[in-house]
Amino acid sequence: MKRILILGASGFIGNTLYKELNSYYKTFGTYFTKKGFGQNHHFFHFDIEEGGLESIIKEAKPKLIISALRGPFEALIETHQFLIDLIDNSNCRLIFLSSANVFDTFEHFPSYEYDKTLSESIYGRFKIKIENKLLRLAPAKYILVRLPMVFGNHS
C-alpha cells in the first residue's frame, strides 16, 4: 500500500486530505498544537522551528509527501529546501499546496497555470519563492497546487 505523509495534517486542509486518503492509503500526518492527535500513532508532533522532519520521514517512509504546512516563512523555506533535496535524491514525490496569491498583482485579469507569477503581498511572494525552488526538480517529482481562498466549516 502506498505510504503518504501529510505535513500539516492537523490543519483544515491537511486534516481533510488525511480523512479522505486514510481509507485508501497508509497515511501519516504531522501536528503542532492541535490536541487529540498525540494518541494517534499515525501522527507525529512536528515543530517547524525545531526541525525533526528527517526522523519523521525515516519512520513514515512515504512515497508521497503533501505539504500543507504553515508557520514562520523563513522556517517554511528551510523545511521546503530540505524536502526538495530529499525528493531530488529519492523516489519520493511532493505535492505542494501553494496559493492563488502568487498572481495577486493581476487582480483585474484571470491567471492561468503557466502565467508568470507576480505578487504584491508578502504571502504571495513567499509562495513564489518556494515554487521557484520546486522548479529545479524534475517535473515528475512534484505537483504544484495553487489554491484560492479556502474557508473553514464555520466561516
Give each language-model segment a name.
Residues 7, 30, 68, 94-99, ...:
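SDR active-site strand-loop-helix element
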Residues 56-95:
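NAD(P)-cofactor binding segment of oxidoreductase domains
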Residues 1-24:
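N-terminal Rossmann NAD(P)H-binding glycine-rich loop of SDR-like oxidoreductase domains
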